[in-house]
């Protein structure tokens, strides 16, 4: 949502930019990241029909993109390893006019009870983007009040963090390079790549949940 990330870092040039919301969906953090670093990444899930809070639906920015820039977006978000494209109904905040958007939702349907907390860095990107877009203050407050993962102090916990992140951050770097190597025409990686990635993802989180977390302290805010 932050222009500094979307436009400057990813070198994407939108043809049009508009603040928008998706009335049927809410922001969530159901995309598993890396424990101790970015445990929960942003996604969206259907709103509870009983939720009447106007700030509950997800707000953000709608970009009009070329097909090449859409491919860049997909690649920058992992080539389909974490997200899949979904077509949803949205509305522009300027005049409430309806539009249809292609957005990214989590590839795995992680239950709300199993979501992990986002990092302070991750929420910082969202809050800066919301401020840049002048999104409703009520929604900005909602982002500011979002609970975040807060690392513990102490040498034992920090030792655990270092031991855990040393192999898994390197695995993430290699995965990112392989995504670009094996990308398809639309920016997505093939099914065999997704299978291997999923095995590594579940292995990483199993190590955290059943070995590392109990010994050194959890790295997901739960």
UniProtKB/Swiss-Prot annotation:
The residues that cross the membrane are 154-174, 187-207
Instruction: Give its E.C. classification number.
Output: 4.3.2.9
List the record's Gene Ontology CC terms alphabetically. membrane
Q: What is its main location?
A: membrane
Catalysed reactions listed for this entry: an alpha-(gamma-L-glutamyl)-L-amino acid = 5-oxo-L-proline + an L-alpha-amino acid
Q: What class of enzyme is it?
A: lyase
Q: Where is this protein localized, as stated in its record?
A: Membrane
Keyword field: Lyase, Membrane, Transmembrane, Transmembrane helix
Report the GO molecular function annotations. Answer: gamma-glutamylcyclotransferase activity
Its pathway, per UniProt, is: Secondary metabolite biosynthesis
* Gene3D superfamilies recorded: Gamma-glutamyl cyclotransferase-like
Belongs to which family? Belongs to the class-I pyridoxal-phosphate-dependent aminotransferase family.
Q: What is this protein called?
A: Gamma-glutamyl cyclotransferase gliK
Give the organism the record lists: Claviceps purpurea (strain 20.1)
> What taxonomic lineage is listed for the species of origin?
Eukaryota, Fungi, Dikarya, Ascomycota, Pezizomycotina
């Amino acid at each position: 949502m932050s222009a500094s990330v979307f436009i400057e870092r990813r070198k994407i040039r939108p043809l049009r930019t508009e603040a928008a919301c998706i009335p049927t969906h809410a922001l969530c953090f159901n995309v598993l990241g890396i424990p101790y670093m970015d445990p929960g990444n942003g996604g969206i899930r259907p709103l509870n029909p009983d939720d009447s809070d106007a700030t509950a639906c997800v707000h953000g920015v709608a970009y009009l993109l070329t097909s090449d820039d859409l491919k860049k977006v997909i690649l920058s978000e992992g080539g389909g390893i974490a997200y899949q494209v979904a077509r949803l109904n949205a509305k522009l905040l300027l005049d409430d006019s309806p539009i249809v958007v292609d957005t990214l939702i989590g590839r795995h349907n992680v239950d709300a009870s199993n979501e992990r907390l986002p990092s302070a860095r991750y929420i910082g990107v969202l809050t800066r983007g919301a401020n840049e877009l002048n999104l409703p203050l009520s929604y900005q407050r909602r982002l500011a009040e979002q609970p975040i993962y807060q690392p513990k102090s102490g040498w034992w916990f920090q030792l655990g963090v270092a031991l855990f992140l040393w192999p898994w951050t390197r695995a993430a770097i290699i995965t990112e390079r392989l995504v670009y190597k094996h990308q398809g025409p639309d920016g997505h990686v093939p099914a065999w790549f997704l299978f291997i990635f999923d095995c590594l993802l579940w292995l990483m989180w199993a190590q955290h949940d059943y070995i590392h977390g109990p010994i050194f302290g959890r790295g997901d805010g739960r």
